[in-house]
């Protein structure tokens, strides 16, 4: 490897998760040991991207479905929190650092994606500011530990895509989703509820506020399980649920739909749901987390 490799530092280590490799490794092992293997080998997972103290245990339910003996390449699709982006962006770096070990960007696949003319590049600053991809790197490194020398990653920052763009990017990624050696990690939290998020939808028939939030999230989750991008868009238009990874999810649903058209049989199931706290009053706030996996039959 030439010493000209560009590295992205683990900029959220020490704040959003432990910067100590041994401590982080033990934490991840602990969370994974609590989760069941039920949807292996996963071809895609949806998992949250909050600080690990909030969502580490939830995310484990998705990462437990990853089979390192099958997977060779991990696509990580995360939403853009800090920059306005109407397309998807690729990184400019060769290596993503984690406290566990360095992850290498798959430059061959990056070249193929770049050739489509549909992608832009994100700056190193944007890359290091963004947490939606980074929060999946330690878990990816842990899940793939036994085959780390064969592993490459394909980080993709997903912008505020229109429905037609979600469809176009779904088509582009569908050929990669068809390959059993690829895993797609879709980075998303679910409802951000409370005045600080400017979202306070409440269905009183559900009882306590946190129950209304759960009901709203599970409505969206069941649509995702049906792999129906149109219904998912309609749900978001109707309820405006603050699912921050709605566009990465939309891309996955469109990619899956594309494969189903070609006779590929697959199923998606959510395996865990959690809330950062239980909202009972208008002063409260919470973020919801869900973990699920897509299996191709």
UniProtKB/Swiss-Prot annotation:
Q: Which residues form the signal peptide?
A: none
A Pfam family recorded for this sequence? Memo
Please name the InterPro entries in this protein's record: MEMO1_fam
Q: Which domain of life is it from?
A: Eukaryota
Q: What does this protein do?
A: May control cell migration by relaying extracellular chemotactic signals to the microtubule cytoskeleton. Mediator of ERBB2 signaling.
Q: Describe the subunit structure.
A: Interacts with ERBB2.
Q: Which family does it belong to?
A: Belongs to the MEMO1 family.
Query: What is the name attached to this protein's record?
Result: Protein MEMO1
Q: Which organism is it from?
A: Xenopus laevis (African clawed frog)
Q: Which gene encodes it?
A: memo1
